[in-house]
């Protein structure tokens, strides 16, 4: 009798101890770069499907940056390329061909060298069929 009681108690303890709640996922907007105080928003462009590229112009007197991040909101977006134009006339293309889901961001893109003054950043992209208007934001640190 004691053995049966001990087995029942052990079974209940194992059942309670092994049960778990599924991981709670944060909504997509929780991953936005905006709340991070150490990142600066350099600009944004709405992708309306009529143009396949846009420029975000940056005030080169403002400051220099080491890293970039792209945030895509509202709709999916196919990013074919990103070209960073520096104040010294050189260019950098980090090979960012990627399909962004709505409300997602890129990995951190390290710029070559140390601190660099950015003149402009060129986005080459396209809307995905069936999607709405996507907003592409450029953040820098």
Please describe what each predicted stretch is.
Residues 1-7:
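Bacterial N-terminal signal peptides that target proteins for export
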Residues 16-17:
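C-terminal motif of bacterial Sec signal peptides marking the signal peptidase cleavage site
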Residues 22-58, 94:
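Transition segment at domain starts
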Residues 48-77:
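Short, surface-exposed binding/anchoring microloops in extracellular/periplasmic proteins
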Residues 49, 81-83, 89-110:
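Beta-strand-centric surfaces of beta-sandwich/beta-rich domains
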Residues 54-59, 105-113:
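Exposed aromatic-hydrophobic patches
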Residues 63-70, 113-128:
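Noncatalytic modules at the cell exterior or secretory-pathway interfaces
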Residues 73-95, 133-140:
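Short, surface-exposed beta-strand/strand-loop-strand elements in extracellular ectodomains
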